[in-house]
């Protein structure tokens, strides 16, 4: 095995080891986003403690993009202890009428895992860190017209100076996964709101942009197929 192949093998093995350690050592969620079907009374999300030894105090809430907790949603239970290798289901309930019925609305689910103090940490200088996970909550009204699978194809792009305007005529919020202008990747392009627009700042030196290539994140948190669109 030559040196380059050996280095790649070691790097791969190390990355697999680290990823398995992370998965085995803490709290995880059953999905990377929650789709709340407006025809249902609630949506759910499973919290998983993958540690064999540690227990955690789990605190959960819903807020908006600005961080305000004044939202139409509550989570039950908002606070509970999660034992090692156990799961618990969070129930997200819409308690306030009045959300738009002609498009999706977006909020955020926050789950904070606080390690319990162990006997071994008594009288020791042990640093315990609470970890918060924040994922999108999409409220999808009942009877919403349109196809979420084809919505990314309907985006329209217009350039104005160093800004690329993305118009979304659909009723669905569309989150970019990868985004390329002249084959140059623009990281964290963001989300285009339903029936709204997003302005993306193009990096210096990108040149004249006539085509955009991108893919988006679907309801399951996976990357959809790449799409190529012209820029007006």
Swiss-Prot record:
Part of the lpfABCC'DE fimbrial operon. LP fimbriae may participate in the interaction with eukaryotic cells by assisting in microcolony formation. GO terms for cellular component: outer membrane-bounded periplasmic space. The keyword RNA-binding does not apply. Belongs to the periplasmic pilus chaperone family. PANTHER family: CHAPERONE PROTEIN FIMC-RELATED, PILUS ASSEMBLY CHAPERONE. It holds the Pfam family PapD_C. Residues 1-24 form the signal peptide. It is found in: Periplasm. PROSITE patterns: PILI_CHAPERONE. Coiled coil: none annotated. It comes from Escherichia coli O157:H7. Induction: Induced during the exponential growth phase. It comes from the Bacteria. The keyword 4Fe-4S does not apply. One of its GO terms (biological process) is chaperone-mediated protein folding. The lineage of its organism: Bacteria, Pseudomonadati, Pseudomonadota, Gammaproteobacteria, Enterobacterales. This is Probable fimbrial chaperone LpfB. NCBIfam families: PRK15208.1. Keywords: Chaperone, Fimbrium biogenesis, Periplasm, Signal. InterPro entries: Ig-like_fold, PapD-like_sf, Periplasmic_pilus_chap, Pili_assmbl_chap_C_dom_sf, Pili_assmbl_chaperone_bac, Pili_assmbl_chaperone_C, Pili_assmbl_chaperone_CS, Pili_assmbl_chaperone_N.
């Amino acid at each position: 095995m030559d040196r380059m192949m050996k280095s790649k093998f070691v790097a791969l093995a190390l990355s697999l080891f680290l990823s398995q350690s992370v998965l085995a050592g803490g709290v995880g969620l059953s999905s990377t986003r929650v789709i709340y079907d407006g025809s249902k009374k609630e949506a759910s999300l499973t919290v998983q403690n993958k540690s064999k030894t540690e227990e955690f105090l789990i605190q959960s809430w819903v807020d908006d993009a600005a961080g305000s907790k004044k939202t139409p949603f509550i989570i039950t239970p908002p606070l509970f202890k999660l034992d090692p290798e156990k799961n618990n289901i969070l129930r997200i309930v819409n308690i306030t009428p009045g959300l738009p019925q002609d498009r999706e609305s977006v909020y955020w689910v926050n789950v904070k895992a606080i390690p319990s103090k162990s006997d071994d940490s008594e009288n020791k200088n042990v640093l315990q860190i609470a970890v918060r996970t924040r994922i999108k909550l999409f409220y999808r009204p009942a009877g919403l017209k349109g196809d979420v699978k084809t919505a990314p194809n309907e985006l329209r792009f217009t350039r104005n100076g160093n800004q690329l305007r993305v118009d979304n005529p659909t009723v669905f919020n569309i989150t970019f996964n990868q985004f390329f202008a002249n084959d140059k990747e623009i990281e964290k392009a963001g989300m285009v709101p339903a029936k709204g627009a997003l302005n993306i700042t193009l990096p210096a030196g990108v040149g004249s942009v006539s085509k955009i290539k991108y893919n988006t994140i679907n309801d399951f948190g996976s990357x959809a197929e790449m799409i190529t669109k012209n820029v007006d």
